[in-house]
Amino acid sequence: MLQIDGSHRFARGWDTHLVQRLHDCEAGKNAVLTGALPGFTSADTTDPHSETHFYAATPKPATQVKWSEEGLPLFSPREVEVNADKLSRPIETMAASSHFTFSHGNLAKVASHDPSFDNAFAWEELWMTYTYWKNGFTLYAPVDNHDPFAFYIQPGMNE
């Protein structure tokens, strides 16, 4: 099951790539792939055929960087710096990313988004992380040495 947030572009074969990465995770049916995706820029973001530049990188796992004034943990993507070239399978990560999650279909049955939330934008990733953890899921970042499979346009990248 794929969940995405915002404008994405996918590389050919993204689905088979993610299925293989999901099967590489030790948590089995309770594995969730997630991470901050590499970016892309496009001459015209409304035209999927416009000239596009994709940044070569793997998804980044999250790390807790500071605390909000309300006492909530704030997460930020980070590069894997030590032995990144030797990774051959996804690694565990501490937080979900709203850029994407990919999992077996049981995630939607057990830990789906709560439809009663009017606006979860500011704390969506924290809620996802807690809900998945509470229901026995393990988060993994597919940071292994493979070609990028998806790209995310972030606000301000085309300005």
Each language-model region and where it sits:
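Active-site-adjacent helix/loop segment of glycosyltransferases
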Residues: F137-E159
